[in-house]
Design a protein with these regions (language model features):
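N-terminal beta1-alpha1-beta2 module of alpha/beta enzyme domains
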Residues: 1-72
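Flexible, glycine-rich active-site loops centered on histidine and acidic residues
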Residues: 5-23, 85-148, 188
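Hydrophobic faces of well-ordered beta-strands that scaffold small-molecule active sites
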Residues: 9-13, 45-47, 77-79, 107-111, ...
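A conserved active-site cap/scaffold subdomain adjacent to cofactor or substrate pockets
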Residues: 178-197, 202-203
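Conserved, mostly hydrophobic/aromatic
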Residues: 9, 37, 41, 49, ...
């Protein structure tokens, strides 16, 4: 049985934009966070791809990864993930081949099947209105070919890209990617940081369908976990109200800019909204290091996950840094 000490800890940054803040400051904060978690001992630092969201500045994922990798030295950096329906596989192979050539052995390519946007935004990204997600298995295979060794009959190559073998991960919040990752023998990351409902079933499907590959000889599961760590449980509960407001705004279709914490959420949400936010954040680790350690031990006992990737969207950058520092204490025992 796997123990908490056997599990790797990583970071997922949505590059949040705060109220009265700017994308430029958010991007600088992202690098500062990457530098800190590198020192804290985290395994990897991933950024997501989101479009047309005023509170998230990680839309140009590949460009941002170059900035992050250039400002760090040992931590792995990667996409969590590139939404493949938005892109031609060749372009992604060239972008990540370039990153791997510049920062060898430090680049991860996490792939998602959803567009990460609405239909209007998807059209603005120059893709078909519908159906592109159905091409995901073929697109993943094509991308893997571009990153693998060149074959004698291969007419189109990614340069850089060919032969770099950038590690591919499949990401998802449903059972589709879980089964595909298992069948392809790829590592699998489940988006339990916002969709924990099918977590246990997705892990089971992935492991049941797993076939050893040149990449993995046994399944490898990563789980997304929302994080709000503070010195006391009371302080963590207070800081978490910024997260609650953000999720509530997402559900209402409102602005996603980060708002400062409040003393109480009473009057800000309706009972059914409070329940919905609670479901969204069902796996959230909110509290002191002692409380979080106990909850993580239960999570690992139940899932036997190999790695946890934590996302922490607090209003003050200093509170985010401190949250990951406290979690590092849990990680190191």
């Amino acid at each position: 049985m796997k123990q908490l000490s056997d599990v790797k800890f990583s970071t997922l940054d949505l590059v949040p934009v705060r109220e009265n803040g700017s994308p430029a400051q958010s991007l600088r904060n992202s690098l500062d966070l990457a530098q800190h978690v590198e020192k804290f001992g985290y395994t990897r630092f991933w950024v997501a791809e989101h479009h047309n969201m005023d509170g998230i500045a990680s839309s140009a994922t590949s460009v941002l990864l170059g900035y992050l990798a250039g400002g760090t030295s040992t931590i792995r950096v990667g996409s969590g993930g590139v939404m493949l329906p938005n892109h031609a596989p060749l372009v992604i192979a060239e972008q990540f081949g370039t990153l791997e050539s510049l920062y060898p052995g430090r680049i991860d390519l996490g792939l998602g099947r959803a567009p990460g946007s609405d239909q209007m935004t998807a059209r603005a990204l120059r893709r078909e209105r519908s159906g592109s997600a159905d091409d995901f298995p073929e697109d993943v295979a094509e991308l893997a070919r571009f990153l693998g060794p060149r074959t004698p009959d291969q007419r189109v190559i990614a340069m850089p890209g060919t032969g770099t073998n950038v590690p591919i991960w499949l990401l998802g919040s449903s059972l589709f990617s879980a089964q595909l990752a298992g069948e392809r023998g790829l590592p699998y990351a489940f988006a339990s940081h916002f969709a924990p409902r099918f977590m246990h079933e997705a892990i089971r499907v992935y492991r049941n369908h797993f076939k050893p590959s040149a990449v993995l000889d046994k399944p490898y599961v990563m789980l997304g976990v929302p994080l709000v760590a503070a010195d006391t449980d009371e302080q963590a509960d207070y800081l978490a109200t910024s997260v609650y407001q953000r999720i509530l705004a997402l559900m209402r279709g409102q602005s996603l800019v980060q708002r400062p914490p409040v003393k109480t959420m009473d009057g800000l949400w309706l009972p059914h909204e409070r329940e919905a936010v609670g479901d969204f954040l069902g796996l959230a680790m909110v509290g002191s290091p002692q409380k979080i350690r106990a909850k993580l031990e239960v999570l690992i006992e139940q899932t036997q996950a190999d790695e946890l990737i934590f996302t922490c969207d607090l209003y003050e950058h200093a509170d985010r840094l401190h949250s990951y520092e406290l979690l590092a204490q849990v990680m190191k025992g």
